[in-house]
Structures are given as structure tokens and as C-alpha cells.
């Protein structure tokens, strides 16, 4: 977090919520903070959220229209002291008529959040600051036909992409530049593009020993540098060779050219994983966490040339069976992250390392430490077995109490979960990502039923517990959950 002084910092995003299961709602959640080097008297501090529609016209300037004004009074008549950390929360539900952020040739819809500070004293603090706000989904079901089936997310334009730069802990001379949409829509055919650029700050990116050219894959041939020099050596040596000293000339040629030919540009293997973390908040301030690897892929980077970027592109599928990001449910927290690691050689697949034995024969990219027993077919990952192939099959499976009962889940190994946690923490980079679903009211149906007496995800961690005790909670339990206090205040 940036704690630089004499600057108004604004952090946050638009998140979905389960305030009411039957009615979709999204929350604007931002935090304003600042630290000053002066002491002054602030008359008032305000914040405003404004939407802007732009339509092209025959004139040079487009037609602009402001809408969806939300105002906050953050403070009045208070003294700002030097070196004190001031923070203010900006929280409010968006109106149902809020359209999504979109940029097209026929017009655009954008939003911004503005914070204004008014004082009559001399100070270094700016009087205003604003940030763009991306609304990734539409909340107007009356305007869109059949909106109960699908709500399109944010378009993948440059304004929706987040750019990050990080240094590798394993290779200190490498800097990785990431570009990806931090807010992404999930559904049939939806993907999350991830662009990774590697840049070497060390001039010594070459290898002069065989087998250490940045890759041990025999199918990948590193590119030799100084090819013109080696060709010149060949042309310069060959006329001087004679039949009498043919062998001597060949050995001399080999000794002379080998140091040049063996210097190769390094390549690195980049592995990407999409990981889902589900946390159940239990009673007595206890919680339990589940981590599932949803996607795994890896590619070799192009040869890294000093001073240039070596780009690797990944396309991560985000299907509708993946849970949407959830941060407002009082008993449930769903988060997603993209883990990236850099290797000098191709590592073995995660499914063969950490997955249970019955999953190691599967070649699917999605692996989970949870699985469901089926009498007609072998066990598979949680994403493929619990959710089913389509949303209709999910509803049919949950409609049957016998299929949705807790004993259908197979034994969960705490040892595997601990190994997976430790292994993910050892990776080089962790990128946060927020996934939004089509229907907020159906998201909870993707999860097993929650019970205050039996945690459907984590009861299997208790080896001494009675695994045959079914859960008495129904999916309607979530509809009676009261919203958080800050939503009532808003």
C-alpha cells in the first residue's frame, strides 16, 4: 500500500454481495486515506460517485450526460495533524439501473469516484483526487431481455487491464511484467487473458556450458548468438586446411568455435495456476479454508535478449462451474488468485505431485483435493463432479437429497491440504483476480449446504467425527442471512 504523504489515496473496487439472495446487488467499496506534512483545519471532506455517458454526434465534441450521483460527507470541521494516518470508508450499494462499463463506437459508459478537500489554510495537500471505477456487470433486469439467464461482464479493453511488475525471488535479475483483467466475467466461453513479459537486468544472461542454456527440454533448441561470427570462423579456417593436416585443422576448428556456439540465450519455463480459496466462517470466531487448483498450464518463454521483453501469453478458461468471488456473505468467503512460477526446466505436473492417487491418472487441467463418489463412474475433480456439466444438472442433483448428502464426499486428507498450502506459498508470484457470475441468486446453489452443526466442506478434517451424520440445513438457510451492519447504515 502506498503511504506517500501529501496525497489523497483511493483504493477499492466494485464487488458483488449476497445482501439478498433473490435480488442482485453490487457494492461500491473504496477506502480513502492520507498522511500530511502540515497541520491545517479542514472545513469539509466529501466524495462523489458519478456516471458519464458519451454519444458521438455530427459535431466535433460528443454529447455527454451525467447520471447515478452518490455523495458522501466524510468529515466536517476537523483539524488535520501532521504525520497522523487518516482513513475514511466509502461504501454504498449501486442502484438497480446502473449499467456496466462499456466502450464502443456508438458511445461509452464510464464512472469515476472523486474526493474533495476544502481548507482555507496553506498546505501541500491537493484539493481533489479522482479514480476511474469499473462496473463489471449490469443490474437492470427490466431493461435487458432474458436478463435472468445472463448478465454480460466488462469488455476486455485496455481500461479493464491491470499492469503489475514484480521481481523474481528465485532469479533476482529477472523482472516480470503482468497484464491481465483483474475483474473478469465467468461463464460459457469466458476466458482471462494473461500477458507475461520477462526482462533481464543482468547482462550475463548467456550460458557457456552445454545443457545449461536455460532449458533442459531436448525438443527445444536454444538460439545460438554470434552466428555470423561462427560462420566467419568457418570461412576463414577452411581455405587454410590441407589434406595433410585435415584432422588437425578440424580439431583446431572445433576448439576455436565451441566457446562461441555453446553460448545460448536463456529460456525459462513459466507455469500458471488458477487457484480458488473458499473460507467458511464458523462459530466462536473459528474458520476453515479450502484451496482448489482450477487450472494449470505452462509454456517456455522465447529467448531473453538483454534490454528486450520476452512475452508469454496464457488464456485461462473461466467456466460457469467456478464459484464467483464473494466477500460480503457473513459465513462464506470466496477468493481467486493466479499463481505464477518461473523454472529453468519443465517441472512435473501438480496433479501427479499433490493430487490423490485416483486423480493422478486424469489428464484434466482442473484438479481438486475434494471429489465426489459416483456409483456409475470413477471419481473426478470437484469442479467436474459436484457441479455437473451444466447448470441444469446442478439443480437436478441438488434437488435429490440422497445425491447432495454429505456422506457422498470422499475422504479428505489434511496432509494433502497442508502440502498444497506450503507449495503455493513457495511460488514466485501471486496475482489477485475477481470473478463475477451470471446470477447472484444461483451462486449459493453451487456450494454444498451449510450447517451450524456440520461444516459440509471441512467436517472431513475431523477424523474422529461421524461422517454419516447428514446435514439438516437447506439452501433456503442463506436467504435468511441478515446483511452486514454497514449495508444497513448505507
From Swiss-Prot:
Its main location: cytoplasm. GO terms for cellular component: cytosol; nucleus. It is found in: Cytoplasm; Nucleus. Disulfide bonds: none annotated. Residues 391-406 have a biased composition (Polar residues). Keywords: Cytoplasm, Nucleus. This is Uncharacterized protein C895.08c. The keyword Cytoplasm applies. The keyword Cytoplasm applies. Residues 370-385 have a biased composition (Low complexity). Residues 370-406 are annotated as: Disordered. It comes from Schizosaccharomyces pombe (strain 972 / ATCC 24843) (Fission yeast).
Amino acid at each position: 500500500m502506498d503511504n506517500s504523504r501529501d496525497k489523497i489515496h483511493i483504493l477499492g473496487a466494485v464487488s458483488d454481495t449476497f445482501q439478498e439472495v433473490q435480488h442482485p446487488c453490487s457494492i461500491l467499496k473504496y477506502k480513502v486515506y492520507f498522511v500530511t506534512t502540515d497541520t491545517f483545519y479542514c472545513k469539509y471532506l466529501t466524495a462523489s460517485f458519478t456516471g458519464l455517458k458519451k454519444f458521438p454526434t455530427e459535431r466535433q465534441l460528443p454529447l455527454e450526460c451525467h447520471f447515478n450521483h452518490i455523495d458522501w460527507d466524510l468529515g466536517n470541521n476537523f483539524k488535520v495533524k501532521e504525520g497522523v494516518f487518516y482513513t475514511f470508508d466509502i461504501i454504498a450499494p449501486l442502484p438497480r439501473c446502473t449499467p456496466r462499463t462499456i466502450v464502443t463506437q456508438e458511445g461509452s459508459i464510464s464512472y469515476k469516484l472523486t474526493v474533495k478537500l476544502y481548507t482555507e489554510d496553506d498546505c501541500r495537500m491537493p484539493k481533489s483526487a479522482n479514480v476511474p471505477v469499473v462496473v463489471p456487470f449490469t443490474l437492470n433486469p427490466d431493461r435487458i431481455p432474458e436478463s435472468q439467464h445472463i448478465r454480460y461482464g466488462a469488455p476486455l479493453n485496455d481500461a479493464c487491464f491491470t499492469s503489475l511488475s514484480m521481481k523474481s525471488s528465485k532469479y533476482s535479475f529477472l523482472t516480470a511484467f503482468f497484464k491481465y483483467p483483474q475483474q473478469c466475467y465467468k461463464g460459457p466461453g469466458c476466458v482471462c487473458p494473461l500477458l507475461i513479459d520477462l526482462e533481464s537486468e543482468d547482462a550475463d544472461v548467456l550460458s557457456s556450458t552445454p545443457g545449461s542454456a536455460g532449458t533442459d527440454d531436448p525438443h527445444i533448441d536454444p538460439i545460438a548468438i554470434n552466428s555470423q561470427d561462427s560462420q566467419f570462423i568457418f570461412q576463414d579456417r577452411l581455405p587454410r586446411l590441407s589434406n595433410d593436416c585435415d584432422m588437425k585443422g578440424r580439431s583446431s576448428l572445433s576448439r576455436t568455435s565451441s566457446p562461441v556456439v555453446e553460448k545460448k540465450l536463456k529460456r525459462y519455463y513459466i507455469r500458471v495456476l488458477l487457484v480458488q480459496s473458499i473460507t467458511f466462517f464458523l462459530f466462536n470466531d473459528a474458520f476453515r479454508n479450502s484451496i482448489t487448483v482450477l487450472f494449470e498450464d505452462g509454456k517456455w518463454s522465447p529467448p531473453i535478449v538483454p534490454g528486450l521483453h520476452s512475452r508469454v501469453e496464457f488464456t485461462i478458461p473461466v467456466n460457469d462451474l467456478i464459484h464467483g468471488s464473494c466477500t460480503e456473505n457473513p459465513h462464506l468467503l470466496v477468493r481467486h488468485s493466479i499463481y505464477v512460477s518461473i523454472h529453468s526446466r519443465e517441472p512435473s505436473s501438480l496433479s501427479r505431485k499433490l493430487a490423490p492417487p485416483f486423480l493422478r491418472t486424469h489428464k484434466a487441467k482442473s484438479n481438486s483435493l475434494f471429489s465426489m463418489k459416483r456409483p456409475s463412474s470413477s471419481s473426478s475433480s470437484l469442479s467436474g463432479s459436484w457441479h455437473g456439466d451444466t447448470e441444469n444438472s446442478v439443480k437436478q442433483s441438488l434437488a435429490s437429497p440422497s445425491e447432495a448428502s454429505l456422506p457422498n464426499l470422499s475422504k479428505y486428507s489434511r496432509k494433502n491440504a497442508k502440502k498444497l498450502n506450503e507449495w503455493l506459498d513457495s511460488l514466485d508470484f501471486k496475482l489477485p483476480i475477481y470473478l463475477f457470475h451470471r446470477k447472484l441468486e444461483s451462486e449459493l446453489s453451487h456450494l454444498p449446504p451449510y450447517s451450524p452443526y456440520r461444516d459440509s466442506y471441512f467436517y472431513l478434517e475431523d477424523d474422529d467425527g461421524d461422517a454419516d451424520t447428514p446435514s439438516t440445513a437447506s439452501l433456503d438457510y442463506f436467504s435468511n442471512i441478515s446483511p452486514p451492519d454497514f449495508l444497513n447504515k448505507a
